[in-house]
Amino acid sequence: MGWSCLVTGAGGLLGQRIVRLLVEEKELKEIRALDKAFRPELREEFSKLQNRTKLTVLEGDILDEPFLKRACQDVSVVIHTACIIDVFGVTHRESIMNVNVKGTQLLLEACVQASVPVFIYTSSIEVAGPNSYKEIIQNGHEEEPLENTWPTPYPYSKKLAEKAVLAANGWNLKNGDTLYTCALRPTYIYGEGGPFLSASINEALNNNGILSSVGKFSTVNPVYVGNVAWAHILALRALRDPKKAPSVRGQFYYISDDTPHQSYDNLNYILSKEFGLRLDSRWSLPLTLMYWIGFLLEVVSFLLSPIYSYQPPFNRHTVTLSNSVFTFSYKKAQRDLAYKPLYSWEEAKQKTVEWVGSLVDRHKETLKSKTQ
């Protein structure tokens, strides 16, 4: 008996990787790839995958209820990756809460109406923190009662959405069956197409090859995008397996891999040093001072808000996020989902470095065309 899967956010960094892996799954009769918009080159890539499995591209809004109901019709599994990721406070709070929280709630309701039995949610490490750069979390695990206390819209919205997904586990579906859910909390995701890495590299290329310091004092365990996608495949397999499902239903899992624990600055450097990019060697402000400057910038932004929208370069949340010791173990995912990274650190590094090389080449071409 064939089954079908809807992937929301399928045009994003993670969503498209999940789609590529889904094509390999047995007895999968249809993949529905949903997003607000798809780049032409991704549409072309998806059309090539049609030879393997029926792949339907759906463009629409996560807040459009009739659209979601149509998208969920006759679907066996929903993988919900769609969200607004915003750690710098660029996007309006209401937009983030609408897409990340209300959109998730509407999708859960659409699953009930369409009797979709399996729902997998892409959560975030930020649901757990960090709340203070002074608090050290090393090899954190699911049994620790960690919860983000920042009012910042992105982590707050992901926390509420994850709670909604896990609370929906056990809901009755329209056809009398039961909805089963789980959530995956990846650590910082890097890899080809990564928006934060891309921004850092492009900024350095326009700054004499000097990488700006984003997190000199941090120790984190970044995770390769291909391994996060693989964890989603294993989660759907587990929730569809009567033997494995009971221990996975209603659970959340930290997803990391064997990428070495390091600072954000060091990761950016390792992935770009062969192209001559280097770390900023200038003296940097002490962390405590950075934190309180961040607070002052927030106050200025708030006071100016009635007349002017001032976007501070950093705030207390970004200082904390970028400079904490915050690492997590994937042992629970290993135990319940049989998760083992699909890509080693060496493979992940090689693939990402090749992609960074393409950014460097593109920059050179741009410079060449400007001088002609």
Swiss-Prot record:
Residue intervals passing through the bilayer: 287-307
Effect caused by changing residue 341 to L: In AH2; strongly reduced activity
InterPro entries per record: 3Beta_OHSteriod_DH/Estase, Lipid_A_modif_metabolic_enz, NAD(P)-bd_dom_sf
Documented effect of changing residue 222 to Q: In AH2; activity abolished
Effect of residue 129 to R: In AH2; nonsalt-wasting form
Outcome of mutating residue 294 to V: In AH2; nonsalt-wasting form; activity abolished
Enzyme Commission number, as recorded: 1.1.1.145, 5.3.3.1
Active site (catalytic residues): 154 (proton acceptor)
Coiled coil, from the record: none
Catalytic activity entry: a 3beta-hydroxy-Delta(5)-steroid + NAD(+) = a 3-oxo-Delta(5)-steroid + NADH + H(+); a 3-oxo-Delta(5)-steroid = a 3-oxo-Delta(4)-steroid; pregnenolone + NAD(+) = pregn-5-ene-3,20-dione + NADH + H(+); pregn-5-ene-3,20-dione = progesterone
Tissue occurrence: Expressed in adrenal gland, testis and ovary.
One GO MF term: steroid Delta-isomerase activity
Keywords associated with the record: Congenital adrenal hyperplasia, Disease variant, Endoplasmic reticulum, Isomerase, Lipid metabolism, Membrane, Mitochondrion, Multifunctional enzyme, NAD, Oxidoreductase, Steroidogenesis, Transmembrane, Transmembrane helix
Effect of substituting residue 222 to H: In AH2; nonsalt-wasting form; activity abolished
Resulting phenotype, residue 259 to M: In AH2; activity abolished
Pathway the protein acts in: Lipid metabolism; steroid biosynthesis
Location within or outside the cell: Endoplasmic reticulum membrane; Mitochondrion membrane
A GO BP entry: C21-steroid hormone metabolic process
Xref: Gene3D superfamilies: NAD(P)-binding Rossmann-like Domain
One Pfam family of this chain: 3Beta_HSD
SUPFAM superfamilies membership: NAD(P)-binding Rossmann-fold domains
Clinical condition linked: Adrenal hyperplasia 2: A form of congenital adrenal hyperplasia, a common recessive disease due to defective synthesis of cortisol. Congenital adrenal hyperplasia is characterized by androgen excess leading to ambiguous genitalia in affected females, rapid somatic growth during childhood in both sexes with premature closure of the epiphyses and short adult stature.
Role description: 3-beta-HSD is a bifunctional enzyme, that catalyzes the oxidative conversion of Delta(5)-ene-3-beta-hydroxy steroid, and the oxidative conversion of ketosteroids. The 3-beta-HSD enzymatic system plays a crucial role in the biosynthesis of all classes of hormonal steroids.
UniProt protein name: 3 beta-hydroxysteroid dehydrogenase/Delta 5-->4-isomerase type 2
Originating species: Homo sapiens
